[in-house]
From Swiss-Prot:
GO terms for biological process: dUMP biosynthetic process; dUTP biosynthetic process; nucleobase-containing small molecule interconversion. SUPFAM superfamilies: dUTPase-like (SSF51283). This is dCTP deaminase. It comes from the Bacteria. It comes from Rhodospirillum rubrum (strain ATCC 11170 / ATH 1.1.1 / DSM 467 / LMG 4362 / NCIMB 8255 / S1).
Length: 195
């Protein structure tokens, strides 16, 4: 069951869903909450490795991923520029905490998509039990560079109540790769292969 704005306000008032900083009333839509862009990004650094082997037997190495992506901080009143065909990771300002019986769904803004900005390449589900800021997977599929500024409304999160709590809340899992993230983290695919 999707939560309406009334449900979202009630869940937040009860402490079942936490969003920090707390969104203003203007950020709460009919069934979602707008989230803002943070100031931290990860970008691919060309020429660091020859390729990324996504599957065994070669397997991906954690050090290769770290070498692939550089970290960029954008200052106050500055913009991060995403050029056509480029991919980058970003992060929300807000930290989101979900209970074991609520999942989140991340959606890009239609107005930004109409200018060529994809906000999540694949990862739109926020698992029950999540606690942290949300990494965004940006891709510019338009013809012009896009200037993205920290603090701008970048996406919306909606919520679904599960019929029962999951037995595997994300933050409680010892193998959760991205729990408590405060900055955009590069892929941790290598930890899948070592498990």
């Amino acid at each position: 069951m999707k939560l309406s704005d009334t449900d979202i306000r009630r869940y937040m008032a009860e402490g079942r869903i936490a969003i920090d900083p707390v969104p203003g009333e203007d950020a709460i839509g009919a069934m979602s909450v707008d989230l803002q862009l943070g100031d931290s990004f990860r970008v691919f650094v060309p020429g660091k490795v020859s390729h990324v082997d996504l599957a065994p037997p070669g397997g991906i190495k954690g050090r290769d991923i770290e070498a692939l992506m550089g970290h960029v901080e954008v200052g106050e009143n500055e913009a991060f520029y995403l050029h056509p065909g480029e991919f980058a990771l970003g992060i929300t300002i807000q930290r989101v905490r979900l209970p074991a019986d609520v999942a989140g769904r991340l959606d890009g803004r239609s107005s930004l998509a109409r200018l060529g900005l994809m906000v999540h390449a694949t990862a739109h589900t926020i698992d029950p039990g999540w606690d942290g800021r949300i990494t965004l997977e940006f891709f510019n599929c338009g013809p012009l560079p896009l200037a993205m500024r920290p603090g701008m409304r970048i996406c919306a999160i909606s919520f679904e109540a599960l019929m029962s709590p999951t037995s595997k809340p994300y933050a409680a899992s010892p193998t959760a790769k991205y729990k408590d993230q405060l900055a955009p983290l590069p892929s941790r695919l290598a930890s899948d292969q070592s498990a």
